[in-house]
Amino acid sequence: MTSTASLEIPDVSEYLEALNPHPAAYLTPGWTVEHANSEFERIFKGLWISPNFLNWHYVGRRTPDIVLDWQSSSDWLISWLKLNLALSPDDPDLTYVLNKMSPITDFTRHWEQNTIPADPASRPWTVRDLDNDSVLQIDMRVWRAGQSSDLMLLGVIRGTVDA
């Protein structure tokens, strides 16, 4: 697989924005958010201050208030990381983020316990919408961007559940 280190990241802002009201983002192999639509930024508050989505998920101050099924979403993230590592073991962005995340106890514990499920493609997340005081069921899905190691993360809002 080709690393994206030397490739220019395409401007997908308009495409991502057209996916509203569903949260969507374009990520590097190291899960750094390069572009995100307004719904993604609104739901995943505090993400802009984190170096990447993984860091936000494991140590973000607001994450426990937003991601209500943290264990399940953590398993999903780890599964995707392991799958991407199997597909692109030499990707510098991916190996860099794994090295940066390894000192984080929760991340390391989940990394050591997790195995890749039969289909890590979609996993429902239960997410609190802090702006509207509601709880959303979001099917999270990741696609690799062509032959690069970049990713598109799309959450399809399936409905609300009782808070």
Residue spans for each PLM region:
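Short amphipathic alpha-helical surface micro-motifs
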Residues: 7-8, 37, 106-108, 133-139
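PAS-family sensory domains
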Residues: 14-16, 20-22, 27-120, 128, 156-160
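Short, charged amphipathic alpha-helical "coupling" segments at sensory-output junctions
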Residues: 1-11
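Low-complexity, glycine/alanine/valine/leucine- and proline-rich hydrophobic stretches
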Residues: 115-163
